[in-house]
C-alpha cells in the first residue's frame, strides 16, 4: 500500500500567525490569556493552548477587566470590536489578514451605501464577523450559500450591488454562485482579487491531484473546520472514499482494506505532527514509505503584531 502526501497541506500563513500570537502573548504576559472563539478550528491546537493557559470564550462579558484578549483568526464583527474597546482590555487581533481584506471590502460598501452580498456558510464565525462590518441601514447586507439562494434573493437596488466571499469555500461551488449572481444581477461588482484565499485554493488543487492517484483519502482536520470539510467533499466528488479525521486514532483498518494507494492531506488549521502520526498508523496497517506529491510552493508569511515581537528575557 503506497502512501501519498498532498502538497501543499496543513498550516497556512494566517493560522501560523494566529497560533503564534497566542503563544507569544502567553510567553510575554503569562496566564491567563483570553481568546474569543477557538483561535483556529483544530481540536489538537486548541487543547494544547488551553493546557498552556489560554482561556477560550465566546462572549466579551466573560473577560475580566484588565485582561488580555485575542480575537481568533476568523475575525469578529465591528460590534464585538467596539465592545472590547469599551472595556479595560488589552486586545491583540489574530484575524487573518486575508479575512481583514474582505472586512475592508464590506466596510467600504457600507460607507458608500452599496448593497453587499456575501457568499458563505451561515453560522460560521468568519461569516458572522464579515457580515458584522456592514452598518448602513440605507443599504443592505445579504448572505447566500447556493445558486438557489441567489434566485430567491430580493435587494433594494439591483444597479448598486457588490459581492464578496468567505475565504475558505469550495472554489468550484463558489464560482457557480458567482455565475448565478452575475446572471441575476448583471450590474453587480465583485472584488478586484478573488476573496478565496491562496491556501484554500492550493489545498483544493492538491487534493484533486491526490484523488487522481489514491483509492482512499484521509483529510486531517477537525469537524468544525470549513476548509477541511471542503477537502473531504472534493475527494468524495472525485469518487473516492474520503474521511475527515481529527487524529490517527480515528482510522479504522477496514477503511484501507484492498487499497493500493492511500492519500493524506490536512486542512489549513491542522499541524504536521498529526499528519506524521497518520503516516505511522498507515505504515502499521501495511503502508510503505510516504511519497510527497508535487505541488505549489508556498512562502507567504504574516507577521505578528509588533508588540509581540520583543524577545523574552531568560531568567537565570
UniProtKB/Swiss-Prot annotation:
Isopentenyl diphosphate binds at residues 41, 74, 124, 225-227, 269. Its EC number is 1.17.7.4. The keyword Isomerase does not apply. The active site is at 126 (proton donor). InterPro entries: LytB/IspH (IPR003451). (2E)-4-hydroxy-3-methylbut-2-enyl diphosphate binds at residues 41, 74, 124, 167, 225-227, 269. It catalyses: isopentenyl diphosphate + 2 oxidized [2Fe-2S]-[ferredoxin] + H2O = (2E)-4-hydroxy-3-methylbut-2-enyl diphosphate + 2 reduced [2Fe-2S]-[ferredoxin] + 2 H(+); dimethylallyl diphosphate + 2 oxidized [2Fe-2S]-[ferredoxin] + H2O = (2E)-4-hydroxy-3-methylbut-2-enyl diphosphate + 2 reduced [2Fe-2S]-[ferredoxin] + 2 H(+). [4Fe-4S] cluster binds at residues 12, 96, 197. Gene3D superfamilies: 3.40.50.11270, 4-hydroxy-3-methylbut-2-enyl diphosphate reductase, catalytic domain. Binds 1 [4Fe-4S] cluster per subunit. This is 4-hydroxy-3-methylbut-2-enyl diphosphate reductase. The lineage of its organism: Bacteria, Pseudomonadati, Pseudomonadota, Gammaproteobacteria, Enterobacterales. The gene is ispH.
